[in-house]
């Protein structure tokens, strides 16, 4: 009988083995991570500290910021450490944990963006009744459901992936433990896993994008009925940042997961993963801050107080 040795740890190969490029990447991604934390935690602090931001729209935004901060924390610190490590090793349990958390926060963000689109529709359709229509009885369950959906999706894929055998190469051609590169090195039949990934990710994408499209379809009908130019400008300002965040996030996720497995190109996909898991969490606070009047006013208020105190 042939002895089969199961893998007990994995090696994250990353996107380069050039020593000079690794040092440069270390400082670059460390700066991105610190900027991500500063931006997202700063936005959460603004929402908590400024009474003008105490409404469902900004509660959703603060939850999105917490998800982005956690999502980046699951991936970036490990990658940064690997840039200056001789052995880029992650344990079997560590890999499973990283994948579970990455899928949880990534999926939660999909659901949250859909909930935020619905929230924008409610606010614009009947602004006078917004606080009543989007009361804690409505937005709190939406937030909880987003997390629950993310956790359930992560459990499905983590269990399905780590029940496979890893008895050959333990080198993952990626920056973190993601589903496609793990399936690529498994010595088991991964056909079921590939179908599971395609249909689960596809279902989530279709449902959440449909909610976004319907919400913004209704918003557009409201805009067309609005005669006031100032009213239209305010609506576009409010919704533009959310549409930008939705487009960038869903575009990369669709490209990464909802396509035939034989079209995967791990090196190319790695760059896409960096964008949606590291760059987008950094950009979201900027997108929402620069295009949102209330957030900009809150920032000016904070810095104004510091200047006066100084």
Swiss-Prot record:
<keyword id="KW-0297">G-protein coupled receptor</keyword>
<dbReference type="Pfam" id="PF13853">
    <property type="entry name" value="7tm_4"/>
</dbReference>
<feature type="transmembrane region" description="Helical; Name=7">
    <location>
        <begin position="270"/>
        <end position="290"/>
    </location>
</feature>
<feature type="disulfide bond">
    <location>
        <begin position="95"/>
        <end position="187"/>
    </location>
</feature>
<feature type="glycosylation site" description="N-linked (GlcNAc...) asparagine">
    <location>
        <position position="3"/>
    </location>
</feature>
<protein>
    <recommendedName>
        <fullName>Olfactory receptor 5T7</fullName>
    </recommendedName>
</protein>
<keyword id="KW-0807">Transducer</keyword>
<dbReference type="GO" id="GO:0007186">
    <property type="term" value="P:G protein-coupled receptor signaling pathway"/>
</dbReference>
<feature type="topological domain" description="Cytoplasmic">
    <location>
        <begin position="119"/>
        <end position="131"/>
    </location>
</feature>
<keyword id="KW-0812">Transmembrane</keyword>
<keyword id="KW-0675">Receptor</keyword>
<feature type="transmembrane region" description="Helical; Name=4">
    <location>
        <begin position="132"/>
        <end position="152"/>
    </location>
</feature>
<dbReference type="InterPro" id="IPR000276">
    <property type="entry name" value="GPCR_Rhodpsn"/>
</dbReference>
<keyword id="KW-1015">Disulfide bond</keyword>
<feature type="transmembrane region" description="Helical; Name=6">
    <location>
        <begin position="236"/>
        <end position="256"/>
    </location>
</feature>
<dbReference type="InterPro" id="IPR017452">
    <property type="entry name" value="GPCR_Rhodpsn_7TM"/>
</dbReference>
<comment type="function">
    <text>Potential odorant receptor.</text>
</comment>
<feature type="topological domain" description="Extracellular">
    <location>
        <begin position="257"/>
        <end position="269"/>
    </location>
</feature>
<comment type="similarity">
    <text>Belongs to the G-protein coupled receptor 1 family.</text>
</comment>
<dbReference type="InterPro" id="IPR000725">
    <property type="entry name" value="Olfact_rcpt"/>
</dbReference>
<feature type="transmembrane region" description="Helical; Name=3">
    <location>
        <begin position="98"/>
        <end position="118"/>
    </location>
</feature>
<feature type="topological domain" description="Cytoplasmic">
    <location>
        <begin position="291"/>
        <end position="310"/>
    </location>
</feature>
<dbReference type="GO" id="GO:0004930">
    <property type="term" value="F:G protein-coupled receptor activity"/>
</dbReference>
<feature type="topological domain" description="Extracellular">
    <location>
        <begin position="74"/>
        <end position="97"/>
    </location>
</feature>
<keyword id="KW-1003">Cell membrane</keyword>
<feature type="topological domain" description="Extracellular">
    <location>
        <begin position="153"/>
        <end position="194"/>
    </location>
</feature>
<keyword id="KW-0716">Sensory transduction</keyword>
<feature type="topological domain" description="Cytoplasmic">
    <location>
        <begin position="216"/>
        <end position="235"/>
    </location>
</feature>
<feature type="topological domain" description="Extracellular">
    <location>
        <begin position="1"/>
        <end position="23"/>
    </location>
</feature>
<keyword id="KW-0472">Membrane</keyword>
<feature type="topological domain" description="Cytoplasmic">
    <location>
        <begin position="45"/>
        <end position="52"/>
    </location>
</feature>
<feature type="transmembrane region" description="Helical; Name=2">
    <location>
        <begin position="53"/>
        <end position="73"/>
    </location>
</feature>
<keyword id="KW-0552">Olfaction</keyword>
<dbReference type="GO" id="GO:0016020">
    <property type="term" value="C:membrane"/>
</dbReference>
<dbReference type="GO" id="GO:0007608">
    <property type="term" value="P:sensory perception of smell"/>
</dbReference>
<dbReference type="GO" id="GO:0004984">
    <property type="term" value="F:olfactory receptor activity"/>
</dbReference>
<keyword id="KW-0325">Glycoprotein</keyword>
<dbReference type="GO" id="GO:0005886">
    <property type="term" value="C:plasma membrane"/>
</dbReference>
<feature type="transmembrane region" description="Helical; Name=1">
    <location>
        <begin position="24"/>
        <end position="44"/>
    </location>
</feature>
<keyword id="KW-1133">Transmembrane helix</keyword>
<feature type="transmembrane region" description="Helical; Name=5">
    <location>
        <begin position="195"/>
        <end position="215"/>
    </location>
</feature>
